[in-house]
Amino acid sequence: MSRVAKAPVSIPAGVEVKLDGQLLTVKGKNGELSHTIHNSVEVKQDNNQLTFSPRVGIANADAQSGTARALVNAMVIGVNEGFTKKLQLVGVGYRAQMKGNVLVLSLGFSHPIDHVLPAGVTAECPSQTEIVLKSADKQLIGQVAADIRAYRRPEPYKGKGVRYADEVVRMKEAKKK
């Protein structure tokens, strides 16, 4: 059995978990998330805990049980506390602002970039060079942050671009004559 799957997922107060066959739905103060669990994983709900165990005789059941446990744990944390991702814009003239559900980015191109945020993700700009994303869905917020970063990844000579707040950009030296 997977080391990750051995630990049960505890369900905090205010979070409701509904198991319908292989479809698991988690509802909390930040919204509702659902996930279809792989057929090789058996899920049991006891009081305020979910346990995951691999079905016998299926090749990758151990790995799938660990994956299912990690995904469900992220769902429980997301609907209870939520996730945040912070992005920084480094560079002369690089700016971000919110217009309704659209994030408008000025990243040194000849035109501004309009990035429409998907449902379930909210953004705010505390300053012109900072973006704070919030969501209950860990996978979705990570994908949105990666999409925004992909418009202008940090370059290794001056460090200009869009970076995660905790990202360390490895700098290169300029070519010497």
Swiss-Prot record:
Gene3D superfamilies: Ribosomal protein L6, alpha-beta domain. One of its GO terms (molecular function) is rRNA binding. PROSITE patterns: RIBOSOMAL_L6_1. Keywords: Ribonucleoprotein, Ribosomal protein, RNA-binding, rRNA-binding. GO terms for biological process: cytoplasmic translation. The keyword Cell cycle does not apply. One of its GO terms (cellular component) is cytosolic large ribosomal subunit. Pfam families: Ribosomal_L6 (PF00347). Belongs to the universal ribosomal protein uL6 family. This protein binds to the 23S rRNA, and is important in its secondary structure. It is located near the subunit interface in the base of the L7/L12 stalk, and near the tRNA binding site of the peptidyltransferase center. NCBIfam families: L6_bact. Part of the 50S ribosomal subunit. HAMAP family: Ribosomal_uL6_B (MF_01365_B). This is Large ribosomal subunit protein uL6. It comes from Histophilus somni (strain 2336).
